[in-house]
A protein has these predicted regions:
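N-terminal beta-loop-helix "entrance" segment that forms/cooperates
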Residues: 40-65
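Glycine/small-residue-rich loop that forms an oxyanion/phosphate-binding "nest" at active or ligand-binding sites
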Residues: 59-75, 80-85
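Active-site-adjacent pocket-lining segments in enzyme domains
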Residues: 6-38, 75-218
């Protein structure tokens, strides 16, 4: 039976949106495994816009949903429409958009909040005990979704791991090619570009994450 998987994007571009490589690798693996995918994003303004050639902030405003549609080839919906009962699993790629648009973790660290529509959607999967995959920096959302005690990884960055621990998560160090699973909560995480030095290194862990998330839907 074909599995239906929701993917929440956070814009388009590593410095101010969804990490494009991570997003495409996840979407490709889902397609290779025969899953039916629907992309979602919050219909809100980005925190800011970054020139990806220089790293400088640009004097303009962009919409997270509109930018995410670039990755989704236009096939995208407002995350307000995302209901866990319509899907078997959820995956959230990383990129600074997860920490600037889906949440304010990049600014507020352990005292961050998650965008309300994103939080409601993700908690729906947690409450339904359906599998969730969080990639790269998006495990920063884990404690807000699941509460204290959730196990997850962002690789081995001490500062970020400390912030996750302060939020109530149990951080587990992880190689770029591996995954960490919280079996009780059906949460799977992988470091991807928190550690990856190439797209193939990122793909190694993301492919394992997608495969495991799909296994957990059975």
């Amino acid at each position: 039976m074909t599995k239906k998987v929701a993917v929440i994007l956070s814009g388009c571009g590593v410095y101010d949106g969804a990490e494009i490589h991570e997003s495409v690798i996840a979407l490709l693996r889902l397609d290779q495994r025969g899953a039916k995918v629907q992309c979602f994003a919050p219909n809100i303004a980005q925190h800011h816009v970054i020139d990806h050639t220089t790293g400088d902030e640009m004097p303009e405003s962009r919409n997270v949903l509109v930018e995410s549609a670039r990755i989704a080839r236009g096939e995208i919906k407002d995350v307000r429409e995302l209901k866990a009962e319509d899907f078997d699993a959820l995956i959230v790629p990383g990129g600074f958009g997860a920490a600037k648009n889906l949440s304010d973790f990049a600014l507020s660290g352990a005292s961050c909040t998650v965008q309300p529509d994103v939080l409601a959607a993700a908690r729906g999967f947690a409450e339904a005990h359906k599998p969730v995959g969080l990639i790269c920096i998006s495990p920063a959302l884990a404690a807000k979704i699941y509460g204290a005690g959730v196990s997850c990884t962002i690789g081995n960055d001490a500062g970020t791991a400390a912030a996750l621990t302060e939020m109530g998560a149990q951080h587990v160090e992880c190689e770029v090619s591996e995954i960490v699973q919280d079996e009780k909560r059906k949460l799977v995480t992988t470091p991807a570009y928190m550690l990856a030095q190439s797209i193939s290194e990122a793909a190694a862990g993301i492919n394992k994450l997608v495969d495991r998330v799909l296994e957990l839907t059975h």
